[in-house]
Amino acid sequence: MSLSLWQQCLARLQDELPATEFSMWIRPLQAELSDNTLALYAPNRFVLDWVRDKYLNNINGLLNTFCGADAPQLRFEVGTKPVTQTLKTPVHNVVAPAQTTTAQPQRVAPAARSGWDNVPAPAEPTYRSNVNVKHTFDNFVEGKSNQLARAAARQVADNPGGAYNPLFLYGGTGLGKTHLLHAVGNGIMARKPNAKVVYMHSERFVQDMVKALQNNAIEEFKRYYRSVDALLIDDIQFFANKERSQEEFFHTFNALLEGNQQIILTSDRYPKEINGVEDRLKSRFGWGLTVAIEPPELETRVAILMKKADENDIRLPGEVAFFIAKRLRSNVRELEGALNRVIANANFTGRAITIDFVREALRDLLALQEKLVTIDNIQKTVAEYYKIKIADLLSKRRSRSVARPRQMAMALAKELTNHSLPEIGDAFGGRDHTTVLHACRKIEQLREESHDIKEDFSNLIRTLSS
């Protein structure tokens, strides 16, 4: 038995697991086989616990499949394996273009100073962190929609410049991307108080560069941005069509990556879908780990409301939290804004927070939401998205090109409206409520297994909620 056994396991796990999961949890593992024991080394305790909790059965199952009664015992360790043997992950890439296929520009070491030895060195720049201390991992409400993003961000905070560099988070407005950026910054500085961590919106980078050009201070600009320990840039899509800014950021990106300095970027869309940004930049955005943040599901929306109320020392009855969460679905910011309005109204009037009170306090917001998201609107949007006719969604046709969009539309109707399953079934050609339930479960399963279905669902949610 040899280390090729782990190669076989990796190949199977890569086929069986979603690409993001494999890249995040399995790819960082190192293996050592000796005395009928397969030791798997994880980069930190967090990864070790996650793999042991989530994938232990998968790995043991594969060992039994390949070795039968001779399957080695599995042991987990934190750290790196002895360097006497090297084991490489299969070459085929799962999340982003392999770095070996695109040569990274090499940073040229500064030449010897020679006759310039007596010239004073440039002053150390003063770093403006801009990290909001209020946004931490502790007050970030985790749910199925953001679990992977939070886990990746946590690892980056614990090990900046390590496995996930750059980390690219994308998703709609108000879903928690900015919160995670600040949480990473706070996490890094908690471990290393003197760390040079800089958070900014992409437009600030552009403004700083323009100012540097105007003041003939571009070298100071470069020195500032290329000497940080972690650069956290929000809404990178605003670099679109700003060629000079993209050029400068391209070189900054390369310098930071070569120096093992952490880069985290956020956007409202997948890197390859950002228009107006050079392909060489979009390619680099995907070099590390790319993770989506989706709109929060009902349970997470309720948890967000309850936590926000608790932070404000407000008692929010559970049934009221469910009432709000079932009607406001698009993003966290909308939820928190609605709750702030409810709290303000309660403080002004001295009334208890009940469902009737919330219905009155949020009547315009709730009316607008119900007007925007209807089953008819969902059917129209889904039909346009998949380039089929609404009549196809209502028909008895069962071909996949029609059945899958129909299931998607039913799942969206359950998620975004307050209609019952029988009502949804009636709206789709008089179908039974069990058909709707099957469609919802099927789409939920496919969102776990298929990146394309997951993207379709997120895109449609974003379109319908905007």
From Swiss-Prot:
PROSITE patterns given in the database record: DNAA
GO molecular function, one term: ATP hydrolysis activity
Assembly and oligomerization: Oligomerizes as a right-handed, spiral filament on DNA at oriC.
One matching Pfam family: Bac_DnaA_C
Function: Plays an essential role in the initiation and regulation of chromosomal replication. ATP-DnaA binds to the origin of replication (oriC) to initiate formation of the DNA replication initiation complex once per cell cycle. Binds the DnaA box (a 9 base pair repeat at the origin) and separates the double-stranded (ds)DNA. Forms a right-handed helical filament on oriC DNA; dsDNA binds to the exterior of the filament while single-stranded (ss)DNA is stabiized in the filament's interior.
InterPro entries tied to this protein: AAA+_ATPase, Chromosome_initiator_DnaA, Chromosome_initiator_DnaA-like, Chromosome_initiator_DnaA_CS, DnaA_C, DnaA_dom, DnaA_N_dom, DnaA_N_sf
The keyword Nucleotidyltransferase appears for this protein: no
Annotated organism of origin: Salmonella typhimurium (strain LT2 / SGSC1412 / ATCC 700720)
Gene Ontology BP term (one): DNA replication
NCBIfam families, sorted: DnaA (TIGR00362)
Cited CDD domains: AAA, Bac_DnaA_C
Name the record gives this protein: Chromosomal replication initiator protein DnaA
Positions that bind ATP: G174, G176, K177, T178
Family as reported in the entry's similarity comment: Belongs to the DnaA family.
Location in the cell: Cytoplasm
Location of region: Domain IV, binds dsDNA: 347-466
Domain comment in the entry: Domain I is involved in oligomerization and binding regulators, domain II is flexibile and of varying length in different bacteria, domain III forms the AAA+ region, while domain IV binds dsDNA.
Region (Domain II), start-end ranges: 86-129
GO cellular component: cytoplasm; plasma membrane
Region span, Domain III, AAA+ region: 130-346
Keywords: ATP-binding, Cytoplasm, DNA replication, DNA-binding, Lipid-binding, Nucleotide-binding
Annotated region (Domain I, interacts with DnaA modulators), positions in chain: 1-86
